[in-house]
Amino acid sequence: MNQEVMNLFNPTTPAQVFDQIRISIASPEKILSWSYGEIKKPETINYRTFKPERDGLFCARIFGPIKDYECLCGKYKRMKYKGIICEKCSVEVTLSRVRRERMGHIELAAPVAHIWFLKSLPSRIGLLLDMTLKDLERILYFEYYVVLEPGLTALKDRQLLSEEEYLRAQDEYGQDSFTAMIGAEAIRELLKGLELERLEAELRAEMQATESDIKHKKLAKRLKIVEAFRFSGNKPEWMILTVVPVIPPDLRPLVPLDGGRFATSDLNDLYRRVINRNNRLKRLMELRAPDIIIRNEKRMLQEAVDALFDNGRRGRVITGANKRPLKSLADMLKGKQGRFRQNLLGKRVDYSGRSVIVVGPELKLHQCGLPKKMALELFKPFIYSRLDAKGLSTTVKQAKKLVEKERPEVWDILDEVIREHPVLLNRAPTLHRLGIQAFEPVLIEGKAIQLHPLVCAAFNADFDGDQMAVHVPLSLEAQLEARVLMMSTNNILHPANGQPIIVPSQDIVLGLYYLSIMREGLPGEGKVFGDMAELEHALHAKVIHLHTKIKYRWDHIGEDGKPVKRLIDTTAGRVMLGQVLPKSPKISFDAINKLMTKREISGVIDQVYRHCGQKETVIFCDRIMALGFYNAFKAGISFGKDDMVVPHSKWKIVDATRSMAKDFEQQYNDGLITHGEKYNKVVDAWSKATEEIAKEMMKEISAVKKNPKGGEAQINSIYMMAHSGARGSPAQMRQLAGMRGLMAKPSGEIIETPIISNFKEGLSVLEYFNSTHGARKGLADTALKTANSGYLTRRLVDVAQDCIITQDDCGTKLGIKMRAIVDSGTVVASLGSRILGRTACEDIREAATNKVLIKRNTLMEESHVDQISRAGIQEVKIRSALTCELVNGICGKCYGRDLARGTPVNHGEAVGVIAAQSIGEPGTQLTMRTFHIGGAAQLNEQSVIESNFDGKITIRNKAIARNGEGHLVAMVRNMVVAVADADGTERATHRIQYGARMHVDEGDLVKRGQRIAEWDPYSRPILTEVEGTIGFEDLVEGQSISETLDESTGIAKRIVIDWRSTRGGADLRPAIVIKGKDGKVLKLPRGGDARYMLSVDAILSVDVGAKVTPGDILARISTESAKTRDITGGLPRVAELFEARRPKDAAIIAEIAGTIRFGRDYKNKRRISIEPVDKDEEAREYLIPKGKHIHLQDGDIVEKGDFIVEGNPAPHDILAIKGIEELAAYLVNEIQEVYRLQGVLINDKHIEVIVRQMLQKVEVTDQGETDMISGEQIDKIEFDRLNVKAKEEGKKIATGTPVLLGITKASLQTRSFFSAASFQETTRVLTEAAVNGKVDPLEGLKENVIVGRLIPAGTGASMAKIREVAVKRDKLILDEREKQAAIVPSAPEAEPLALPPAE
């Protein structure tokens, strides 16, 4: 008896131990081997007795008893009859739980096709038989016969015959002269008759022979599926079912409701239809019914089985009584409500509660306040056991009573139980791992959970009604993990960027800012203090103010560890702040001897963490929080109407702008400017005005005012809030006290009448109406953004979930080059910030002395980065996840520092998931809109380059000409001007536009702010490179050129018009040529004629016969029209990059280096070819639509990777032409740019991890003598494995090129079918996997969660390792014992074995 009670917790069947899971197609024999009996009747349960009907869908004889250890008729009850089969009702006496495990089956009277293999595209049956889906369906649904064996007749093999044709053929050739069949039997015979080996050989031969690309692809597809069937051991005829399995009844329950009705699973309905139709078919066949009736019944049976497996995939959806589609077996797995995502990947858990959160400012960082009522409920089992141990109760029932009465001893025990037992707090949505953290509970009265203010940033929580959930880690291991890994004190740094995330905000910042203000002319200025006591005395006696400038004697510890005293200029407030600083020689008083804004405070916390360690940081954070709150309260900073200062000059600026707008309106009415130009100019003028007013307002608000009583007055409180970073921003202040500015229409365009009022003055009705558009759109955007961002995160997690740190070093020599990112002259991301925490790939040497500064494989710490920046090194090669050579996972050296800990990354760290969370979490902060760049509204196009540093100019790729006016002009597109400082270190680099006017030349010295170059942002010039006389070609008035008079200036403009649309203009090729003295077209120095092709809308700047010198402008192409393009920004751009989509107007990139040649035009496309420099390569040709402007001329030299036509490059092209490193650099920069605009910091390595996952496939270009098929995409690992095998066998190896897959595609093509099936397109993934007989090695996180094991990351990885070692040891011991047993047959007592040491 006792044994059985213990057994309740252990399943009857021992849990299977397995390392991998294989999925394949079930054969009829297999289905029968699972089954415990055939289901012959559609009945379920008897409506009166509620007992299952015999042979029905719930039959107890087949599936097992309904009550534990009790047969159906009640003859055998209790445990003692276990295993007996009752002779009356034939039910086995056992646990009722077997009804969840035992399956049944239905023998079909006619075979039916499995809909997944038929309809899931591409149709597997169709591919194997090489028949179209339409033909297959015609045969299956009894419309056409198919000839199986033509015999000696004129019919062809597999020919389709309609009813009439079949009868005619029978009359013509006689009944037995040929074999034709119809329905699933026919298909089954066809599949049975396939000889796979022969078919494979034929296909391979055909592939070698074929020239056509399309045919090759088709054959490759067939070959793959034939191979799949051969190697997986599946037989093709198993795709046609003769037996249908029936799942256990407890997985499709039927529950009686009160009132005599039943709630049932849809599957029972679907099974019932199958059984009904099957039985009817059997009966009809026995009765020898007419063919047509039987055929109809067979078709209905096929439809019933289709609906059971996948309702709605073919034909109408079968609906239940309430017009709702029935949920079929496939629907049980699919989608968010399916088995995978609803029950396997996320479950509801025990021991949890949720409540509203309130602020707990008196808590320590590692604590949270837990309401007593909640704690009592959550820790019940612990309390019961402790009551029992103390002898206060003997039974659970008694303990329950005590707890329910809430006796005083229960509270004492609760205190004991809760001591040092951490709980997990979680706030939904959990966007990154900091959304769940562990705290030690502190019991509190009330019903709300108290949360420490500093962790709010990590949870993204505020106290306006947010709720949080509490979970209790039960086992000792769980408690240990919670304490060591998840405690809030261990999560000081943000995993996305390594910056502190436990940073004061709002009130605390304001208090610290107030504390650290220094004001001139206050009482007691210049007094000297020796210690804190004197200072406090003086403050209380009002001799000095918090903000008074004083001198103070500061004691601190020097570098040598001895105390040092020094006198510093500071304020009383800053000294108070200095008291909470940890004593360390690395942290000086200067760290806080300044105005403390949020940024400064964050910097100090970072410094403390780096130099003093975690414990000190936590204590410091708690102290500075208390100080901040106290001083915010003492300061009493409030917010009054008069704090919003409207600048005096506001109306002056508004009036000036109004008159400008009026002028533009007038110019438009006079026809001098177009509507678009007027709109752009007006919008531009108002944007400038808004900026100016905002500047004036800031000037007035931040101005230091004098106090009438002497000294400086209190600082404006709104300014304090915004400047300290506590709340608000200059943009919001502008709306409060400046002017609200321009608003957007719902379509995204800007309304040209701005809102002149601010909130202090109040808006007029019209202004208010105009402002509602934008506000409403903002709210709608926010709602959409959340969903989109969540979906992006889900795709990212899915693609990267199996990226885990598995080894220390993969030993690769590869890496990627890093340099600072410079955007229009300003350094956006310094080299130091990009290489911090990464591993050097090669020795880093000083440029001047060639001395090794940093050895290869060194993890770069802050000190190394300082060394590099001091040495002025511009480029560093570092190791990266992209170049890591490990097969499974990434190595620690290639990954670098674990950003959340600041130490080298640990084994088993799930870096893929962290990367996905780091990129996905800020997704909600990104914008959703597509920017329309319309003219000047956002046209702060840079048209001037000024130097940001003093230095010396160097020019790379130099090509400068002095034009007719004596100006220097840039003649090439890839010219770069660099400014170097006195040591020769490059401080800034600028890309110079083609045709820009240069103000400096090589070797010139420039001062900061001096102009380097300028150009016209509204047009692109075409320049001449030789001196000569102008001639026109094909520039025919009225056909390819038209003259218009510019009314504002009265000058005639000649514009190239679309010559293809004019009469007789189709063959024209308009160009300007430059002729020499002999009247012949001159040659260019780089080869080719001096002929400049013109595109539509070019404006000519010269006349026939004019003399030109190099650098003169021949024509301009106005870019005003090109400026209204859409720029995809924000989230859609990030998604577009990760999905590796081809942009709409993709750039065309030169695939080889060479010379441009213009070929014959083709219809309305231009033909451009590149003559290669390297004679071994073949020339490349590109067809470009004629309207597109090509900025290259005949004879231009292009490098590999140059743009021939501007635009966004397609990432695939970058990969194909420039390789992996360039692609990675492009993706990282583009994605970072989107996040940078929103001020979000993400470390590059996260994006690199995701890009690594996108590059896992190889396309086979030449199959060599391997089993691969050229043109197929194959896993890199598999590709290498097959090549190694071929090499060992002395065969020719295959070659391949890396393929870039978007994240969705990459997730669906992972090695694990479990992971792919639970992501998207479940049906397709499972069908594919079953046909291939795929094995899931259970390597990723997702698969292991699904099968219910520890994940192979973090502590789960260590557990797996320990288990491995244990198994090895056991084996050694057992072998040793066997040996000893063999040597000594009857030794009395063997010596104890010495264990081999652990690995």
Swiss-Prot record:
Taxonomic classification: Bacteria, Pseudomonadati, Pseudomonadota, Alphaproteobacteria, Hyphomicrobiales
Binding positions (Zn(2+) 2): 810, 884, 891, 894
Family annotation (Pfam families): RNA_pol_Rpb1_1, RNA_pol_Rpb1_2, RNA_pol_Rpb1_3, RNA_pol_Rpb1_4, RNA_pol_Rpb1_5
Keyword Nucleotidyltransferase listed: yes
Co-factor binding details: Binds 1 Mg(2+) ion per subunit.
Coiled-coil segments: none
Top-rank lineage group of the source organism: Bacteria
Organism: Nitrobacter hamburgensis (strain DSM 10229 / NCIMB 13809 / X14)
Subunit-level organization: The RNAP catalytic core consists of 2 alpha, 1 beta, 1 beta' and 1 omega subunit. When a sigma factor is associated with the core the holoenzyme is formed, which can initiate transcription.
Family from the record: Belongs to the RNA polymerase beta' chain family.
Residue numbers binding Mg(2+): 462, 464, 466
Record field: catalytic activity: RNA(n) + a ribonucleoside 5'-triphosphate = RNA(n+1) + diphosphate
GO biological process: DNA-templated transcription
Cellular component terms (Gene Ontology): DNA-directed RNA polymerase complex
Keywords: DNA-directed RNA polymerase, Magnesium, Metal-binding, Nucleotidyltransferase, Transcription, Transferase, Zinc
Main function: DNA-dependent RNA polymerase catalyzes the transcription of DNA into RNA using the four ribonucleoside triphosphates as substrates.
Entry-linked HAMAP family: RNApol_bact_RpoC
InterPro entries linked to this entry: DNA-dir_RpoC_beta_prime, DNA-dir_RpoC_beta_prime_bact, RNA_pol_asu, RNA_pol_N, RNA_pol_Rpb1_1, RNA_pol_Rpb1_3, RNA_pol_Rpb1_3_sf, RNA_pol_Rpb1_4
Cofactors that this protein relies on: Mg(2+); Zn(2+)
Protein name: DNA-directed RNA polymerase subunit beta'
Gene3D superfamilies xref list: 1.10.132.30, 1.10.150.390, 1.10.1790.20, 1.10.40.90, 2.40.40.20, 2.40.50.100, RNA polymerase II, clamp domain, RNA polymerase Rpb1, domain 3
List of residues binding Zn(2+) 1: 71, 73, 86, 89
Gene Ontology molecular function, alphabetical: DNA binding; DNA-directed RNA polymerase activity; magnesium ion binding; zinc ion binding
